[in-house]
Amino acid sequence: MYKTKLIPVMNEDAVIVQQTDSIQDPKVTPDDTVVDSSGDVHEAIDDDVEASSPMELDSAVTNDARVLESERSEKDGVVGSEEEDEIKSEDVLIDKDDESSEVKEEEEEEDGSDDQSSELGSEADEKELDLGLKEEKKGVSDYKSLLSEFDDYVASEKMGSGVSRALSYGFEVGDLVWGKVKSHPWWPGHIFNEAFASPSVRRMRRIDHVLVAFFGDSSYGWFDPAELIPFEPNLEEKSQQTVSKHFVRAVEEAKDEASRRSALGLTCKCRNPYNFRPSNVEDYFAVDVPDYELQAVYSVDQIKNSRDKFLPAETISFVKQLALAPQECDPDSLKFMKKKAVVFAFRKSVFEEFDETYAQAFGTKSPRSSVSTLEPHNRAPPRAPLSGPLVIAETLGDLKSSKKPTKVKVSKKKDKYLLKRRDEAGDKSVQFGEIEASSEASHIQGIDGSLDGDFGLQRRAPTLQTPMKDEKSGIVSMDFASSNTAIPGKEFSASKPSLDEEKGLAEKSKERMEERAAVLPEHGKSEAMASLKPKEEAGTDLGSAGSSLQPLLESHTSASEGKSSTGSVIKKVKVAKRSSSEMSSENPPSEPKKKKKKKKEPDSDHPVKRKNLYSGEAGAKKLSQLGSAHLQTYMEADVPQLLSHLQDLSLDPFHGLSVASFGTARKFFLRFRSLNYQKSLSVSSSDATVENARDTKPSKPVKTVKRTEDPSKAGKKRLSSDRQDEIPSAKKLKKTNQLKSMASEKKIIREAKDSIKPIREPSRVVQAKPARGQTGKKTAPSVKVVEPTMLVMKFPPGTSLPSAALLKARFGRFGLLDQSAIRVFWKSSTCRVVFLYKADAQTAFRYATGNNTLFGNVNVKYFLRDVDAPKAEPREPENTKEDDEPQSQWLDQAPPLHQPTLPPPNVNLKSCLKKPVDDPSSSSNNGNGNRAAVRVKFMLGGEENSSKANTEPPQVTMTLNRNSGPSSSSSSVPMEFVSKKFQNVVHHQQLPPSTLPPILPLPPQYTKPQQLPIKPVDHVEPPMPPSRNFRGPIPAVSAGDISHQMLNLLSKCNEVVANVTGLLGYVPYHPL
């Protein structure tokens, strides 16, 4: 027999009623549901359903199929049990009475033959009814199989292994989590229900993985629950990973979701029945939480948990606390945001939703009219959760913090740099450091620490100190990585050998130390000094002092412990350096004394410097002055904390700004360093190389340079002269630091000179050329002789020239510059920079000639020229500099034309600025003096002075002697007394040598007006061969007194100088 089966179809009202019953809404009851005697739910098919489109039917059937899924499963179970009972009963009946059953079967066969016609009629009626139902529900039967398969898939997925695995790790569907995506930081997201995902997303499913939807970019991925971490406990750490706008937006969305879930517990259907709308998945609702995005999908369990988390007492306490201290709350914290969301949601649910009085009072539009509360189905989600790209989870061996991930790389580079600089001290220092680091690592295996500090601490430790320092003196101890043990929170990544291996390595290292100290004392000490110098000159004075302090402080505790043989080796040397009595009782400290005596023999040229070095006994006596009680006080204070401050400072230079007790630690280590290191600073090897390059005679010893530095800084030990060639790389690496120190010293000198003299010295005798050899023998920067030297740069024609500011930036680091003398000559493609000290100019010249890319890929030629004229004129230094460069270049190439006879330099000239016309006769005697006594050149008027120089020399200081003849060499011609205009004229004319002596007055037709404009002063002829110059006539000046012209010249100078200011960064000139 065939039974008629009606397929149940529910309308929207029925679905809403059934789903909202779980949210406790007894007001609405189903209208169209009919329950028959067997418990099956049947519903009438409305006319609207018949007229509906296939898509609407599909949605209706889908809702119906999902709602009745649980009912079907229950029915299947009941039917199955009933069938089993029937089978059992039939078996019993057959066993009891087989004969009666056979009789019944015969009777049924007879009855069947009689009623066969009636059964055929009933079957025809059933077929007709089935055909009618199929015609009424067009297309529904086509979807039945697909919907059933989909329901089965969803049911299996919901109870899949991924969800069960997530539950084992404490996660549930919908929880907020952090997931690590490849090539991205930890990203916020939430565990997404797979039933809402599209088929394309579900196809990518992995076994035992859960679907995570991320915030921000709506990306998604399949993650192992073991690789996820909770959101709220890790928010403070993970939110600081990066400042990318996408990441910040994702974190904000995650915080907003957490706040919305807090407000979800106080959201109800009292005012708006459409706040909770059923979704396509069972037990999930689309909820509209006020003040948040619409259509947030939550499960029934999430809604109940949110309601259970609401604590009225806690909410009232929060409101009271906020009222008492509104500024003490952190508005950006997640806890505050969640509590605020609860308070606002409570207010929305209890008080009037739309405040009409506010709109009336301020004349604004009523919020009630602007919000449509009865149209929930027209709302669309602002963004699909899985609309972004699929991301791949990063496989994590163990959960590590990715905060500031680039710090590890920086530490690696820094450690490689330090190891490279300190390996020249010898292989044994690195070997001992590795042994010590491995032995120390075995004692701190249980300490957890951040990965950021591992590399810096592990690899820097072997090179902080070397064992040769212990052999050199009894003060500095052998300690490589022991400072790491005093700092908790750090761990080593180095290999950890067994205890027997450590003992064997320690014994070998001890034997090698003794052999090295006994057989090669000189070599060991030299290497110790070489290893000490890069450490101190690398800018790690505090670090070196702290690391050497570590064994001193630990000697009190390690003396009684002696856990390993390595510790005993360190203990022996540490104890030796603490007092003179202990030093005299043991053998290893006695060896440094012998080495000190031997060290003085090869360096007999430096007896004074060697006296300043500490011997072992003297250092111990100096250290013993602290007293054991004094040291014990420091150790009892908190020695590990002091060492922790020191090591944090080495990793972060600004560590002391945020630590209150850092001042105490700094005083402690400075005090220790001042008691254990020499105070007299000897020049380093890089200083010696620079000074030797500055024409220093190699036979003379390098004198001690008294630097104006902090007296509390550690001393620098000078290498012996026979060992300087073994550390060439250290010299190169310290080049930058040396240049910086030179610049700072010269700045101090300049400030001191400016405070002594308000105006540049008007009368100062410039030293002659023989003084050049003395620049390398300067004993202190304060006694350096000002010897202006200019660096001339000749660029190829047609290339762009650097500006004055660029020249100042390129060469300012080499020393003090005369900024007013920097010139850029565009016509001749020449630039000029004047250094106040010749040594600085030589350093800059060597650097420029060795660097081909200083001004780009341009072939620049560099020349050094002496500027022997005094800088007494504060009014016209630029004229002085302009005359020097082309004159020196031309005089080296052209035959002498106006070289005077050089009288003895026994006249100290007076400044013509103070008395320009009072004593013209006194200046006439100096016009032809030698270049050592020449002092002034004023050529702003140009040709009027130069022309008179040829006719009436006894009247002017810048004129030539009539009786002067050509000198033997052009190199002795002074550049100071030749004017620019006269030089240019001679430069153009190029008369043959036979016409040079003597110089006679020129005919009057060659005479030119006396006054010339001032502009040509800034354009000096370039230092090029005479053949390229234009040949012009030589101007002449009529004989007579030049006092009037001199007054005009001085007045014009005053007018020019009066308008000069310091707006462009130059020092303003002082008026006359």
Curated annotation (Swiss-Prot):
Disruption-associated phenotype: Delayed flowering associated with reduced H3K27me3 level on FLC. The triple mutant pdp1 pdp2 pdp3 has increased levels of FLC, MAF4 and MAF5 expression, but decreased expression of FT.
Residues spanned by motif Nuclear localization signal 4: 733-740
Short sequence motif named Nuclear localization signal 1, residue ranges: 402-409
Transmembrane segments: none
Region (Disordered): 21-133, 365-387, 486-619, 681-738, 871-931, 944-973
Residue span(s) of domain PWWP: 173-234
InterPro entries: PDP_family_Arabidopsis, PWWP_dom
GO biological process: epigenetic regulation of gene expression; flower development; regulation of DNA-templated transcription; regulation of photoperiodism, flowering
Basic and acidic residues: bias regions: 66-77, 498-526, 706-729, 871-880
Biased composition (Low complexity): 25-38, 921-930
Complexes and interactors: Interacts with MSI4/FVE. Component of the PRC2 (polycomb repressive complex 2) complex which regulates histone methylation on histone H3K27.
General function of this protein: Together with PDP2, PDP3 and PDP6, interacts with MSI4/FVE and MSI5 to suppress FLC, MAF4 and MAF5 expression by regulating the function of the PRC2 complex and modulating H3K27me3 level, thereby promoting flowering.
Protein name: PWWP domain-containing protein 1
The species this protein was found in: Arabidopsis thaliana
Gene: PDP1
